[in-house]
UniProtKB/Swiss-Prot annotation:
Highest classification ranks of the organism: Eukaryota, Metazoa, Chordata, Craniata, Vertebrata
Biased composition, class Low complexity, residue ranges: 42-53
Protein name per UniProt: Protein Red
Family affiliation: Belongs to the RED family.
Organism: Mus musculus
Gene name of this polypeptide: Ik
Modified residues (Phosphothreonine): 485
Amino acid sequence: MPERDSEPFSNPLAPDGHDVDDPHSFHQSKLTNEDFRKLLMTPRAAPTSAPPSKSRHHEMPREYNEDEDPAARRRKKKSYYAKLRQQEIERERELAEKYRDRAKERRDGVNKDYEETELISTTANYRAVGPTAEADKSAAEKRRQLIQESKFLGGDMEHTHLVKGLDFALLQKVRAEIASKEKEEEELMEKPQKETKKDEDPENKIEFKTRLGRNVYRMLFKSKSYERNELFLPGRMAYVVDLDDEYADTDIPTTLIRSKADCPTMEAQTTLTTNDIVISKLTQILSYLRQGTRNKKLKKKDKGKLEEKKPPEADMNIFEDIGDYVPSTTKTPRDKERERYRERERDRERDRDRERDRERDRERERERDREREREEEKKRHSYFEKPKVDDEPMDVDKGPGSAKELIKSINEKFAGSAGWEGTESLKKPEDKKQLGDFFGMSNSYAECYPATMDDMAVDSDEEVDYSKMDQGNKKGPLGRWDFDTQEEYSEYMNNKEALPKAAFQYGIKMSEGRKTRRFKETNDKAELDRQWKKISAIIEKRKRMEADGVEVKRPKY
C-alpha cells in the first residue's frame, strides 16, 4: 500500500515462467483491491519450520536480565499481591474464630457470662411471669444460697463491689492473703542470710604457727572500719531548749542540725598544733599594736598650738594587772570563752578611745567656729543702731537681777526717741530672750512674726559680710564623722553657703545686671520686718504716753 494517495503505484510483475497468453486465465489471474483486502484479513498460517534466523556475527552477546523483561515483572507483581491477599484471608479467619456475637447469644439466651448474675438481678421477672412451683422453689433456693455465700464467704476483689465496713469476710480473707505473702517474703529474705552464715571462716583454713602471726592477720584483714554517724560530728547536732517557756523542765528539746560547711572539719582540728596557736595569737597582738601606736597628723591650723595632753584615764587598760597571755596546749571551754571576752573588751576599749579622740576634735572645731562667729558679730552692727563710743558688749551674766536692771536702763535711755528701732548685737543668743520685752516680743504681734528678733540685725551697707566668702581650703571641709548624727550633718550641708572671692570683689552678675558688693536684698521678708518695727515703735510710744497720763486715741476694732 502506498503511504500517500497522491503517489503513483503499479501492481507487481508476474513471476518468471508464468504464461498469460490464455485470455481466460489472464482474466482469472487479474487481482483487484478487494482480493488484496481479503488477503490482509486472512490470518497467517503457522510456519512448519522456523524461519532462518539472521546471522548477528557483528553484535556482542547480551545476558538475560529479568528486571528488564515486562512479563517477568508482571509475574512478580501478581505473586506479591497474591501473598498479601492470602495473609489477609488467614487473619480474617483467625479473628472469626475468636469473635463472639454476644448480642446473638443474648437473644438466643445462651450467654454464659451472665448466668450467675442474672439470677440475682432479675428479681422482677418472678412477678412478671408466673412460674411453676418447682421452678420458683429451685430459683429461690439458688438465689438465697448465692446471697448467703456472698455475705459470709465473701467474693473476690475483682467481682465484688466493696462497701466500707460491710464486707467483713472479704476483709479477713484479704488480710490473711497479705499476711501469708509477707511471711513468704520474710522467709525468702532470711534464706540468703542463713546461707552466708554457714560459710566457713577463712581464718580457720589458714594455719598459724605463732600467736603473733594470727594477731597480724587479724589486724590486717579483720580490722573493721568504724561507721561514723554524720549527725554526731563535733558541732553538727545540738539541742535547742526554750528557757523562757513555762514548761521548759518537762518539754522535749528541739534538735538543731547544722550544715557541714558550718561545722569545723576534723582535719583542721587534728593538724592544728601549739605552734599554730602561738603564731595566730602573735599576729593578732601585733595588729593591735600597729593600730594603737598610729600617730595622728596635725592639721595646719593646729600646728601652732600646743598639743593637748590626754588624761591618763583614757590610756588606762582595764586588764592592766592581768599580764601577758600565755597559750596553753590544753584549754577548757571556760578559758576559751574568757579569752574571747577579753578580746571583745579590748576591741570595745579601743573603739571608745577612738570615739573620744573624734569627739575631742569635733569639740575643738565647734569652739573655733563659735569664736569666729563671735568675732564676726563684733564687727557687725545694725543699720538703725546709733554710734557708740564703746563697742564692747555688756556683761549680762550677773544673775537674774542684772537682766532686769539692763532692760530698765535701756528703757530710760531711749524713752525720748519714739522712732528708735535699733538693736544691739549681743554676745550670746540667750541675751536676745532677756531683751525680748524691750523689742515688743511680749505683745500680741509676737505669734504672727516669730522670727522678728533674729532678722532685726540687718547688715550694714558700709561693711561686707565675709562669713560666706570662700576662704580656700584652710580649715578643710567638715565630713560626716565630724558630726554626731546624720541629721546634724544634713542640716550643716543644707545651710552651707560659700561665694567665691570674685563675687565680693566685682559683685554678683544677676539677671537685671551686675550688682555691686553693696547689694542689699529687698524681699517680702525684709518689708515685713520694716513694717513690724514701725508698728512696735508706735505701740511703745502709746504705752509710754498712757503711763504718763496722756489720753491716747484708741482704735475702734
